[in-house]
């Protein structure tokens, strides 16, 4: 199982200096990838988790870090398709793949925030079918010399989009979502599946099995798919025995990583943005960076 690390994008520690520090340190330590996530806004009463109160844009962050790294892959988990144009996203991500010399992974999801749906003018009606068409348009723009699409939701006249991404036929698409239909969609359409912050990690093997079975039914090779897990790590030594996976001492977290690999996860990225003691506006930014350094060193793949 490959290990990645989420860069600071949420809360007080999400500064340019800390982003570069974490990205470079992760690359030096042998981590496979760096990750971000998307959150456009938060409700005025701030009723959500503090992780979502102040979040940097994911693609802009990855473009910034592409200039400060050379080897690690750069991923977003996830961009929410209902809020985006597949044509604009195709251009943005093709450019980012070029700037990063072919290191981009594109995670896509449907979103869950009513506030974001309303603010962006998006509709939840038939959003699953719209997502499938979104992926079709995105792939066509990335890989075809001339693409044309006439569907229920998107109309693309005979069109060229250049320059193309470095990765051929296109950057990997990882679809998110926990609902059965989302898992089946990933098996039919995507290059892999990425779990969200609310995923039941104890049951992740069943989700992976659903994706694989659907891929096989569609005539695809399940063994070629990637299964990426967002590891919302919280280092809490001396915690309760009935702890959540990836919450506990570093030794316990290492054991959890092994169990997730056995469950079929092919890549996990450690995400401290979802620790309220780190990824919140009220957290001490320097203390958060120091804690991240400790986790980076302790879980480094080379050890």
Regions found by a protein language model. Give the residues of each.
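N-terminal beta1-alpha1-beta2 module of alpha/beta enzyme domains
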Residues: 1-68, 169-171, 273, 278-298
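Hydrophobic faces of well-ordered beta-strands that scaffold small-molecule active sites
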Residues: 3-7, 34-36, 74-77, 104-108, ...
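Active-site mouth loops of central-metabolism enzymes
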Residues: 5-16, 79-87, 167-178, 237-251
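Active-site beta-loop-alpha junctions enriched in small/polar residues
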Residues: 8-10, 39-41, 79-81, 109-115, ...
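Short, acidic/polar
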Residues: 14-26, 88-92, 175-185, 246-260
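Internal, glycine-rich beta/alpha segment that forms the wall or movable "lid"
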Residues: 18, 42-49, 63, 76, ...
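An alpha-helical appendage that flanks or caps ligand/catalytic pockets
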Residues: 27-28, 32, 125-166, 196-303
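Glycine-enriched alpha-helix->loop->beta-strand junction motifs that scaffold or abut catalytic
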Residues: 68-71, 100, 187-193, 264-266
């Amino acid at each position: 199982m490959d290990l990645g690390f989420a860069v600071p994008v949420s809360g007080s520690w999400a500064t340019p200096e800390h982003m570069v520090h974490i990205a470079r340190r992760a690359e030096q330590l042998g981590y496979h990838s760096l990750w971000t996530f998307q959150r456009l806004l938060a409700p005025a009463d701030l009723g959500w988790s503090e992780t979502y109160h102040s979040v940097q844009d994911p693609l802009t962050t990855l473009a910034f870090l592409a200039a400060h790294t050379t080897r690690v892959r750069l991923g977003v988990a996830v961009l929410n398709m209902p809020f985006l144009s597949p044509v604009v996203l195709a251009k943005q991500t093709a450019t980012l793949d070029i700037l990063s010399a072919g290191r981009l992974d594109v995670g896509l999801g449907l979103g869950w925030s009513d506030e974001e749906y309303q603010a962006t003018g998006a509709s939840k009606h038939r959003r699953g079918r719209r997502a499938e068409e979104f992926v079709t348009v995105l792939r066509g723009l990335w890989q075809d010399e001339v693409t044309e699409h006439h569907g229920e939701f998107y109309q693309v006249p005979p069109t060229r989009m250049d320059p193309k991404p470095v990765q051929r036929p296109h950057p990997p698409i990882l679809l998110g979502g926990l609902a059965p239909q989302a898992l089946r969609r990933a098996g039919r359409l995507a290059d892999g599946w990425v779990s969200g912050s609310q995923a039941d990690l104890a049951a992740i093997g069943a989700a992976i099995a659903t994706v694989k079975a659907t891929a096989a039914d569609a005539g695809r090779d399940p063994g070629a798919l990637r299964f990426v897990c967002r590891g919302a790590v919280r280092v809490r030594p001396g915690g309760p025995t009935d702890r959540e996976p990836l919450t506990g001492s570093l030794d316990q977290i290492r054991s959890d990583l092994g169990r997730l690999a056995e469950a079929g996860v092919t890549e996990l990225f450690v995400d401290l943005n979802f620790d309220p003691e780190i990824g919140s506006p009220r957290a001490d930014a320097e203390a958060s960076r120091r804690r991240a350094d400790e986790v980076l060193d302790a879980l480094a793949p080379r050890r």
